[in-house]
C-alpha cells in the first residue's frame, strides 16, 4: 500500500494506488447481491471466465472532490450509472441498478476518506466501477455469473500537457478506434486494449497520444486517445464531434451546457472534418481523466495545426467546471452528489 503521508498531491500522475477498501457485488441466479466493502484487492476467478477470453467487461470512471468545507462531492454519478447500463446491455450483461451503483460509489468514498485529495490540490479521488463476466465457461456466450466492483485511487493529471503545462501534442493514427456499428459508443474493455498500439506509436514519436479518425472515410475527427475532442472557432463557437462510434462523454456533455448557458457561446455537436482544423483557435481533449487538456498541436499527414494552449475560453471552461466539481459554484440540478 502506498504511504499516504508521502503522497505528493500536486504531482500524482494517473496510476494505480491501493487504497483501503473496495466494493464488490455478485450476480448469480438472476439477481445482484447487496454487495459490500472488502479490503482485499486481489480477485480469484475461474480460468473459464468470459472476461479472460472474450472480453466481456465494461467499466466507468468518475471522480470525487473535496470541497472547501471538507465534504466529498461526486460529479454526475447518475450519468455514469446510466452509461454503465448501456454498456452492459451491449455485451448482454445484467444491468447494475442506479441505486446499487450510487450506493457502491458512496460507500467506497466514505471508507477511503483519508485518500480524498485536499481541497484545491489539483488531485482527486478517481473511482473505477466495472462489471466482468466470470464463472466456468468455454464457448462464446454470455457468462452466468458476474462481478460488479468499485475501487478508487487518488490521481492527478492524465496528460502531462495539462492546463498549467502549456498544452498537449497529438498525431493522427492509421488505426481505427472502433468499427462502424461496433462498440465505440460504449465503454467496454476491448476498445481500450485495441488502442494500446496506436498510443505506443504516438508516444514513441514524442506526442502525448493519438487522434482517431472516423473508421469509414478517415476524414473526420472522432476521439483524442481516451478522451473526447472539442474546438473553439475564431468567432467563439464551441464545436465537438458527433458520431455513433464516439463514447458519449459526461464531461463533454457538461461542457456543452456550461459553454451555452454560462458563457453564452454557440454550441454545435456535429461532424468535424480534418480540413476544418484551421477554423479553430483553441482545441482540447476532455473527459473524466483528462478533465480539460488544452491541445497545442495536431499533426496530420505531415502538416501541423497549432492552437492557443490554453486559450481564453478553454481556461474559462476549465475554471468553471472545476469550481462546480469542488462545490464553489452552484451546479445545475443533479450534477453534484454529496457523500454523507
UniProtKB/Swiss-Prot annotation:
Reactions catalysed according to its record: L-leucine + 2-oxoglutarate = 4-methyl-2-oxopentanoate + L-glutamate; L-isoleucine + 2-oxoglutarate = (S)-3-methyl-2-oxopentanoate + L-glutamate; L-valine + 2-oxoglutarate = 3-methyl-2-oxobutanoate + L-glutamate
Keyword Amino-acid biosynthesis: yes
Keywords, ordered alphabetically: Amino-acid biosynthesis, Aminotransferase, Branched-chain amino acid biosynthesis, Pyridoxal phosphate, Transferase
CDD domains: BCAT_beta_family
GO molecular function: branched-chain-amino-acid transaminase activity; L-isoleucine-2-oxoglutarate transaminase activity; L-leucine-2-oxoglutarate transaminase activity; L-valine-2-oxoglutarate transaminase activity
Cofactor: pyridoxal 5'-phosphate
Pfam families: Aminotran_4
Residues modified as N6-(pyridoxal phosphate)lysine: 187
Stored PANTHER family: AMINO ACID AMINOTRANSFERASE, BRANCHED-CHAIN-AMINO-ACID AMINOTRANSFERASE 3, CHLOROPLASTIC-RELATED
Role played: Acts on leucine, isoleucine and valine.
Family to which this protein belongs: Belongs to the class-IV pyridoxal-phosphate-dependent aminotransferase family.
Name of the protein this chain belongs to: Branched-chain-amino-acid aminotransferase
Origin species: Helicobacter pylori (strain ATCC 700392 / 26695) (Campylobacter pylori)
Lineage: Bacteria, Pseudomonadati, Campylobacterota, Epsilonproteobacteria, Campylobacterales
